[in-house]
Design a protein with these regions (language model features):
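Peripheral terminal and linker regions in Fe-S/redox and tRNA-modifying enzymes
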Residues: 1-180
C-alpha cells in the first residue's frame, strides 16, 4: 500500500523540487563557530570536583561535531511537575540562555525536552549553575524519569483519560528506587 501511495504522489505538485530545496536550505545556515580546541581535560577536572555537575554532564550533554562545543539537553521532567511542562517564565529564561550560550537557537524535541545545540564546553559549568538556580538542571535524559507523556484529560478536551498522574507515579516510584541504591 505504501508503494502504491508513493506512485500516486512522487511527481505531484507537492513534491519539492531541487530548486525549492536549495532555496529553503539557504535559511538554515550554520552558526559562525569559533575555532576552539577540545577542552576535555578541563571539563574532566571540573567534573571530578563536582559530582552533581558530573552527573548532569553525563546525562544531559552530548558531543558536538565542532571541537570545543557540546549539545545540551534541558530536561523538562523535574519531579512533581507534569512531564514536558514549562512556565512562561522558564521559557523566557531559556530563551535568554539560548541567546547567551547557543547562537540564539533553542530546539524543542519530540521527547518533550529542550536543546541548546551549540554550547561552548568552557561555558558548561556556568550554564549548569544557571539552570540549577532555576530548577532546570534535572540530570535524567534517557532514564525512566525522562517520561514522554500526553497531557491527556488534564489539558486536552479530546482526551478520555488522564495520563499525567500515571507518569508522576512512575516518576515517584523510580525516584524512590534510585535514592535507595
Amino acid at each position: 500500500q505504501v508503494e502504491a501511495e508513493w506512485l500516486l504522489i512522487k511527481d505531484s505538485p507537492s513534491t519539492i523540487t531541487l530548486e525549492e530545496l536549495k532555496r529553503t536550505s539557504s535559511y538554515f545556515t550554520p552558526p559562525t563557530y569559533e575555532d576552539l580546541p577540545s577542552d576535555e581535560s578541563t571539563l574532566q577536572s571540573l567534573r571530578s570536583q563536582n559530582k552533581a555537575f558530573s552527573n548532569w554532564v553525563q546525562r544531559n550533554v552530548r558531543p558536538h561535531k565542532m571541537n570545543g562545543y557540546a549539545i545540551v539537553t534541558l530536561s523538562l521532567k523535574k519531579t512533581g511537575v507534569p512531564p514536558g511542562d514549562a512556565t512562561a517564565d522558564q521559557i523566557d529564561f531559556v530563551a535568554d540562555l539560548a541567546d547567551r550560550y547557543s547562537f540564539g537557537e533553542l530546539r524543542v524535541t519530540h521527547e518533550q525536552n529542550l536543546v541548546l545545540a551549540d554550547v561552548k564546553q568552557s561555558e558548561l559549568l556556568a550554564l549548569w549553575e544557571e539552570l540549577k538556580a532555576h530548577g532546570l538542571a534535572t540530570p535524567n535524559i534517557g532514564l525512566l524519569t525522562d517520561i514522554i507523556c500526553c497531557p491527556g484529560g488534564d489539558f486536552c478536551s479530546l482526551a478520555n483519560a488522564k495520563s499525567i498522574p500515571i507518569a508522576q507515579a512512575i516518576d515517584r516510584k523510580s525516584t524512590r528506587l534510585n535514592s535507595s541504591h
